[in-house]
Amino acid sequence: MTTEDQTISSSGGYVQSSSTTDHVDHHHHDQHESLNPPLVKKKRNLPGNPDPEAEVIALSPKTLMATNRFLCEICGKGFQRDQNLQLHRRGHNLPWKLKQRTSKEVRKRVYVCPEKSCVHHHPTRALGDLTGIKKHFCRKHGEKKWKCEKCAKRYAVQSDWKAHSKTCGTREYRCDCGTIFSRRDSFITHRAFCDALAEETARLNAASHLKSFAATAGSNLNYHYLMGTLIPSPSLPQPPSFPFGPPQPQHHHHHQFPITTNNFDHQDVMKPASTLSLWSGGNINHHQQVTIEDRMAPQPHSPQEDYNWVFGNANNHGELITTSDSLITHDNNINIVQSKENANGATSLSVPSLFSSVDQITQDANAASVAVANMSATALLQKAAQMGATSSTSPTTTITTDQSAYLQSFASKSNQIVEDGGSDRFFASFGSNSVELMSNNNNGLHEIGNPRNGVTVVSGMGELQNYPWKRRRVDIGNAGGGGQTRDFLGVGVQTICHSSSINGWI
C-alpha cells in the first residue's frame, strides 16, 4: 500500500495526494448528506381521511340532530353531553360521576354521515368529531331554519347565521349597471348575466346597423344624375344601349340630345354608348356626341331632318309608331327633367332614371310593335285625341308630365315645319293619303282642339306643376287659326329651349 492511497482517520480527516482528490471530495459530500438529512414536512390529514385504526360510529339522523341526547330523570331537562348531565345530577343530590382519564390510551372515534348519497357516508371519508358531523349534516342535508332580515339569506346552522348577521350590510358590491349587492355570490351571478346581456345587445345593434346599411345601399337608383349629366353607378350594372329594340341604320342629326359629359377620357369614348336617344334607338360614336350647351346655338338643317327627329326615318314609320306608342303607354317609365330653383337663384336639375326596367320595356315594345305595325296615320291621330279626352274626363284632371312633354314636342316640331312651308312633306311622311286625310278631317280636328269640348292641354310644364288649375289654349298665328293646320292638340307653338331652362332642357 503506497503513501498516496493510505488514509489517516485518527482525527477524522483525510490526508491524500493530488491523485486522490476527486475520490475524497465525493466521499466527503456523501458524509455531509448523511449528517444533515433533508427535512420532511408532516402532511395533515384532509377532511374525510381519518386514522385507519379509529373507531367508526354511525348515527341515525334523528339521534344526530337531537339537541338533548342526555335527559335528567328528575326534571326532564336535556343535555348534549353526558358530562353536563352528571353535573346537573349533583344539584338534585343524586349520585354523579365524571369520567376519569386513565393512563390507558383511549381509541379515537370518527363519525360517518347518515345520508347514503353523501361522500362522507363511506368509512374512509368519515369526519373526526361529533360537532363537525352535525354541522355537515345540517348544512348539506338539513333544513335552513335561520334567515337574515337584511339580505334574506337562510342558514341551517345557527352559528353561521349569527356570524353573518354581524357583517351583513357593512360591505356592498356595485355593478356597472347601478345595482348594489350586499352578498358577493349574488353580485357575481348578476355580473355574469349583465355582461352576457351587454354582449348580446352589442351584437344585435351591429346586426341592425348592417341590415339598415344594406337596405339603404339597395334602395339607391341605378343611375345618378348631376346637373344634366348621366353618371353610371359603379356598383350596379348598366342598362343596355337599346332599350326599345335593335338599332336601325339611320342618319344622326343635330336634334338628337344624348346626355354626355363635357370632360371624358379616351376610355369613356371607346365604351358602348349608354345614352338614350329621345325618340329612336341607336348607337352614336364619340364624333357624333353633342353636348346640351351646343343645342342653344342655331344650326342649319333640312326639313327631312325635322321629320326624322319627330318620327324617325320615314321609311320605317311602322317602327316609329311602335316606339312612340310604347313611350306613351309606359308613361310611368319616363320621367321628364324638372328644374328647381335653389337658394342662390341658380337652376339645378333633378333628373330621375329614364327607364326603370329595360327588359320589361323591351318586351312590351316588341309586343306593341306586332299589334300596331300597320297602324295608319288616322289611327295615330285618333289615339292622340283619345289621350287628350281621357286626361280631361274630370275638371280637376290634368295631363301627365310625360304626355304633356310628348305632345308639346310633337306640336312644336310640326308647327315649325308648317310655318316653313313644308306641310305637304310633313303629312307625306305618314303615307300617300295623309294629305288628303288631313284636308278632309280638318274640321273634325279643329273640334278636337275646341275648348268647349273639354279637351285642353297645359301649355307649359311650369304651369302644370305650380298652377294645375290654370289652363290656356294657344292658337297658331295672330289671326286665330289662319294656317294650313289646326292646333288640334291645344299645346300651341312652343320651343324646346326656354330662357329659364338650363342646357336646353325644360
Curated annotation (Swiss-Prot):
The gene is MGP. One of its GO terms (cellular component) is nucleus. Residues 1-53 are annotated as: Disordered. Its main location: nucleus. Transcription factor that regulates tissue boundaries and asymmetric cell division. Contributes to the sequestration of 'SHORT-ROOT' to the nucleus. Interacts with the SCR and MGP promoters. Does not show transcription activity by itself, but regulates the transcription of downstream genes through interaction with other transcription factors. Binds DNA via its zinc fingers. Recognizes and binds to SCL3 promoter sequence 5'-AGACAA-3' to promote its expression when in complex with RGA. Positively involved in gibberellic acid (GA) signaling. MGP expression is SHR- and SCR-dependent. This is Zinc finger protein MAGPIE. Keywords: Activator, DNA-binding, Gibberellin signaling pathway, Metal-binding, Nucleus, Phosphoprotein, Repeat, Transcription, Transcription regulation, Zinc, Zinc-finger. Interacts with SHR, SCR and JKD, but not with itself. Interacts with SIEL. Binds to RGA and SCL3 competitively in the nucleus. Residues 183-195 are annotated as: SHR-binding. A zinc finger (C2H2-type) spans 70-92, 111-141, 146-169. The modification Phosphoserine is found at residue 60. The lineage of its organism: Eukaryota, Viridiplantae, Streptophyta, Embryophyta, Tracheophyta. Zn(2+) 2 binds at residues 175, 177, 190, 194. It is found in: Nucleus. Expressed in the ground tissue and stele cells of embryos and 2-days post-germination roots but not in the quiescent center. Detected only in cells that perform asymmetric cell divisions. In roots, present in cortex, endodermis, and pericycle layer. GO terms for molecular function: DNA-binding transcription factor activity; sequence-specific DNA binding; transcription cis-regulatory region binding; zinc ion binding. A motif (Nuclear localization signal) lies at residues 133-140.
